[in-house]
């Protein structure tokens, strides 16, 4: 983008409806140096931190946890839903974003959604990471990775794939393709391959709830 538009200043930001879009900002030279980051917190409006599942703040750099935001722009709460409000706020006004990420030298990096992290045999697996590797295959048009309960390992990693028209791909071929791209425990154990478009919700995202029920 910068090469094509010499006078442009590429930028990206991060925020949620619940934070009135306030969160982080990455623009100009910072963006060119850290293109994978959604930026730094916007002072003095926002503070951003990382917590574990027990609301303990993680001070170590590059440690993955849930992104939390504190800001005067944060919502007061969900309309007539006190229980849902309590689930996402602590007593100090920090809001749980539902996004997994880490902070490196002040720059925030988003890894995945909390609900899209699959725990398989004690290992955390990012669905986005696996989907990205699968999309590298030239036959794949759509791919949705998700977990389903499994007694021995906790969750099984599954993927539903829609192939491009006239293209073919077997489970064995996909597994072989992924061996050089992913650790073995990140390769899905359940693979559904077809030519039908994957179901989506109103926002356009894949309906992983519906896929789990198939």
PLM features: residue spans?
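AMP-binding/adenylate-forming catalytic core of the ANL superfamily
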Residues: 71, 76-77, 87, 98-186, ...
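Conserved ATP/PPi-binding loop(s) of AMP-dependent carboxylate-activating enzymes
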Residues: 24, 40-45, 56-88, 125
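Gly/Ser/Thr-rich phosphate-binding loop
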Residues: 1-33, 47
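Beta-strand->loop->alpha-helix junctions that form or flank phosphate-binding loops
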Residues: 10-20, 38-42, 146, 192
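Core-facing hydrophobic residues within beta-strands of well-ordered domains
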Residues: 7, 43-45, 140, 188
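Short, P/G- and charge-enriched loop/turn segments at secondary-structure junctions
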Residues: 31-38, 179
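Flexible lysine-rich "adenylation lid" loop at the C-terminal edge of ANL adenylation domains
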Residues: 195-214
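Conserved beta-loop-beta connector loops within the AMP-binding
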Residues: 4, 49-68, 87, 105, ...
